[in-house]
Amino acid sequence: MRRRLLIALRSNFYFARAALLLIGCVLLAIAGCRPQRGGTIVVGSKNFTEQIVLAELFAQQIEAHSTLHVERRVNLGGTLLCHQALLAGKIDLYPEYTGTALTAVLNEPPQNDPSAVFHRVQDQYRARYAVEVMPPLGFNNTFAMVVRGDDAAKLHLHTISDIRAFAPKWRAGFGYEFMERPDGYRGWVAAYGLHFAGEPHILDLGLLYRALADRQVDLVAGNSTDGLIAALGMVALEDDRRYFPPYEAVPLVRRATLDKHPEAGAALRQLTGKITEDEMRRMNYAVDGEHRDPAEVVREFRKAKNL
């Protein structure tokens, strides 16, 4: 009797184990058919305030509309460093500008039509890099040639052409990238026929306006959405010869990332056309001028926009 009971118990044990294994295999098969949830996505940025703000916006937007964990790797450096990090898979996305992508990355000549620039960049990034150029965020951030407000008033400066007579006595200050890129210093001075008093000072982007305010230089190349320009009483000169191409802000995302996590792309598309130049300028000033946390500034913006 005991022997039969032991045999029965042993048989039930093996049957139960086989059943559990079968159930486990079925559950694994079902899980494999479902879209992948969770995971980590890495957002990068260049080394200036607007980029850090936009990267934080991308991160919060993805976190709010997916189950993804978002890692922030901001302040990486210039355009080419971010581009290389994207291609190497060190980051999954970062904010870029269409004119920068066209000239500094693709090494193509500037164009003035925003739509043509966007579609050219989008097509080439897909073909060359397997990177998706998502729709513009809504604002253009072009280079701004900035002078002190008192100089602009005294010398009646409104356009870049207006400085030609004064440039030979002026010291200019630019970031390293502006000095090197195809749409930067060399083409700019040639287009406007400018000559300065010696070679330009190479300045860290965070020190440009301080150097101008302290009269270490007389002109700098900033960004048109910099909040400090007006706050410091400075003046951005009109690009009257339309030298600079459009620089529409766009998210750049690895195609492999979008294929793996389509919810990230859906979240980012909700940002299309949502930021005006004034809104971007105010966010930049909140960080630069009021020394507020970029994450807090972005949370307020997203709440105001119902994002």
Segments predicted by a language model, with ranges:
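C-terminal motif of bacterial Sec signal peptides marking the signal peptidase cleavage site
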Residues: 29-32
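Short, well-ordered beta-strand elements
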Residues: 38-50, 68-74, 168-173
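Short, polar/charged alpha-helical segment
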Residues: 49-69, 87, 182, 186-190
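Short helix-initiation/N-cap motifs at beta->coil->alpha
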Residues: 69-84, 198-210
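A conserved helix-loop-strand patch within extracytoplasmic ligand-binding domains
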Residues: 114-172, 255, 273-277
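Ligand-binding pocket segment of bilobal, Venus flytrap-like solute-binding proteins
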Residues: 168-239
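An extracytoplasmic/periplasmic, membrane-proximal ligand-sensing/linker region
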Residues: 179, 183-184, 189-191, 262-307
